[in-house]
Amino acid sequence: LKHGIPTVSRFGGLLELKDKKPMRFVEIIMYDGTSIDPLEIFIRSGMTNYMGAIKTGNGKIGASFREFPAHSRDMVEQLADRLKRIGLGGLVKIGLPGQSLLDIPVNEGRIGAIVIGGLNPMSIFEETGVRTYSRALAGLIDFKRLFRYEEMEDRLREFL
């Protein structure tokens, strides 16, 4: 968003890897159909195989599918390269305008992109029998609990 690229997050899913290459989504949950992060569901359900993905290049990892305007493809690629250089390479694959990406249809005038899910490292714990409690940085809150950011310092003083 900082770079003026409007993004549509379509779904979170389990991305199957073979020989370290993304093959297909084997499960998906549309973001507009849940208030829980789909990756949390897949991890807690024991559906991931992140250990296999990092050890052999074959497994199932959490990933999300995003869409960007087609004219922003070059900028998205540049940003992905910059992030990768500093160790934050999360974009797995970027599609072509109006073309399906891993058999997922993309709206006309848009490109698809697959982004590695941030909760994936937590799946290692679950896969090895260590129960975890994690929540994505999203959720619902009662509107009455919100306040202006200028009040933050005073509110923090109440707790210190």
What are these regions (language model features)?
Residues K2-L160:
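Anaerobic metallocofactor- and corrinoid-dependent redox/one-carbon enzyme cores
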